[in-house]
Amino acid sequence: PVEIILLKEWYVRQTHIQDRMRELIEEIEFHPVRNRQFLLDWMDNISIDWPISRRRWYHTEIPIWYSENEEYVIVPPAGTYVQPWRENPPAGSRVLRRDSREDVGSFEAMTETLGNITGEQKVFDTWMDSSNSNLFVSGYLNQPEIFDKAFPTALRPQGKEIVRTWLYYTLLKSALLLDKPGFQHVWIDGLGMDPWGRKMSKSLGNGIDADSVLECGAGGRTGSWKVKGPEKTVNLKANKIGSECFRLWKACEAQVGDDFHINPEEIEQKYFGVLTKLFNVARFASQFDVPNDLDSIPDDLNIEDEWILYEFNAVMSEVKSAWTNLDIYTATQTLKTFGTGILPSH
């Protein structure tokens, strides 16, 4: 049996604004489009308001003090960080009626009425802080001239496992405060999976430290990783990866929104040779002088050179279109095909 203990908590209203949020979400471009449904499915199951207070030791303190008779609350000036459990209200704090939130005066003028005040000991839920991210980077409250130009924030890149938390609560806060969509674009990527197709997690012990993969090959260092498989622990090894090979692998391995397998051995086998070939092509091309006029094509080119320039322009057009649509996979695959196949052969 589970014993249910009723405790008073702080909540943010959210059930009343769900329809308006859906309207605002329609203004956001999702990448891939299908992953918008993750968010909508979660919203379909919201039936209560958002409990934002937690009983923990470490996090952002809820900036509230209570009067002795608990009929009033004291709040600090906007933007002030306080620790109510150990500090008194700072200068400029205001007193509100607890039931109506009516502002009834300054803390300094009402100290006798309030009696012995008590500071809130609870802290905010972690997503209460994290949902400020788009507002913060856009200059909300601090840089209004920038905020007017920068909001809605251009892009939110994130994984699909936190759509119901980070993405949803960020959009909720933007809707409540500003009645605007929180972003112009939302990029929802897949999850990193182990070689057996399982999500990497601490509980399974099947994770691979990214720093060790990036350092593999630097200064002659080799990489070795012990990964817990379904039946036994497997030792994976690689000699040369590094940051550039790692980036190329991630860009080429999966389309946006798809899960991707992380196996250092395969990263080295598939992409180190590709990276080396691209480097050699670039080094060969760098031996020649850059023409003064890159916009016009010389009249005396042979048919093979005219063909490769046509192919190059087609590649650049496709790459620019892909980048504009935040499709890194298509852009990188197109460059890889041209840079390791068509151009070297020419």
Q: What positions do the PLM features span?
A:
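Aromatic-rich surface patch/π-platform used for binding flat ligands and interfaces
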Residues: 305
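Structured secondary-structure scaffolds
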Residues: 1-291, 308-346
